[in-house]
A protein has these predicted regions:
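Sequence/fold signature of self-assembling virion shell proteins
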Residues: 2-37, 42-60, 84-88, 106, ...
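Extended, solvent-exposed, turn-rich assembly/linker loops in the middle of proteins
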Residues: 137-215
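Short acidic, glycine/tyrosine-flanked loop/strand segments centered on an H-E-D-like triad
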Residues: 79-105
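Alpha-helical scaffold segments that mediate packing/assembly in large oligomeric complexes
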Residues: 101-169, 294-304
Length: 304
């Protein structure tokens, strides 16, 4: 029997609570793979604003022939080249959480810490983008194709270029995610992460060897391959790079301990709230322009 005048949600709305759980949907960030790989010169810039790295390979020795016994030897003094990185780019993120609002916000969310972490990772992403942007200064930028998918020959040509310049160890590849998953992973010479034990990275090719096994996506011809959403892709052409660790250099000012990003908090009476400022001071630059090669690929292409 259907009753009449039964209670419904509208009748009981004053007694039905709305709940907020502990879950919070947070911003996603890339893995900072290039910061872990490039030459970190931060320890050199405790004071000052320019890092100097002597280049003794541009001007080199040549072998002399001793034609006449007893003849005085010919001395050589190849000039060094001064390679510099200026560390003076400062970026920051600042916000205030006022007392009234924070007294009303659920404490389980720990908003101050969450927003500080978001700001820190945003600034680290700026550094990652600056490093990826250095591809335009590499000597070799024309491998691959701007109108087609990456091919096995493109990868082997990059290896031939690197080994032709004596770069055999300490090399890695950084690819756009579309190039890797829609094109490159289908090549027979690639061993994806799930199919390999990665002895090649066990020695800690990256600065943080604990992350190497999780960040690396595959190994091709013995070279670890990493992916990143920060690989530049002008006009839908991914600028994938094969790099030696000495190709790119960067430095950050250690404003707070060993962290790249400094976080400061200060209560502001005039604002009745807590000010949080995160900042980073960094510089990036090419150390060896010939120690890397751009492998172009059309990011919209697919390979079955």
């Amino acid at each position: 029997m259907t009753g009449t005048n039964t209670f419904n949600n509208a009748d009981l709305s004053a007694s039905i609570p709305e709940k907020w759980g502990s879950m919070m949907l947070e911003q996603k960030f890339p893995e900072f793979v290039l910061q872990d790989f490039a030459s970190d010169l931060s320890d050199m810039i405790v004071d000052g604003d320019i890092v100097h790295v002597p280049n003794i390979y541009t001007n080199t020795f040549t072998a002399s022939t001793q034609s006449t016994p007893g003849t005085e030897v010919t001395l050589q003094s190849p000039a060094e080249v001064d390679v510099t990185i200026t560390v003076d780019t400062q970026k920051y993120i600042a916000f205030i959480l006022d007392d009234k609002t924070m007294a009303q916000v659920a404490r389980s969310y720990n908003l101050s810490e969450k927003y500080a972490q978001m700001a820190q990772k945003t600034l680290l992403r700026e550094l990652e983008d600056a490093l990826f942007g250095l591809y335009t200064s590499l000597t070799a930028t024309a491998l691959g194709s701007t109108i087609a998918a990456i091919a096995d020959l493109d990868f082997r040509s990059a290896i031939a270029y690197m080994e032709g310049l004596e770069f055999r160890d300490g090399t890695a590849v950084f690819m756009g995610v579309k190039t890797y998953f829609n094109q490159f992973i289908g090549l027979s010479k690639i061993s994806p992460n799930y199919a390999s034990n990665f002895g090649v990275v066990a020695s800690g090719l990256l600065g943080n060897s604990g992350q190497a096994g999780t960040q690396v996506k595959g190994v091709a011809y013995g070279i670890p391959v990493f992916t990143s959403t920060r690989v530049p892709s002008p006009t839908a052409v991914d600028k994938n790079v094969m790099l030696h660790s000495s190709a790119y250099g960067f430095a950050t000012k250690k404003l707070q301990g060993s962290s790249k990003v400094r976080t400061q908090m200060d209560y502001k009476l005039e604002n009745l709230g807590t000010l949080t400022v995160c900042d980073i001071v960094y510089g990036v630059g090419i150390l060896r322009a010939e120690a890397g090669v751009v492998i172009n690929s059309l990011s919209t292409s697919t390979v079955a």
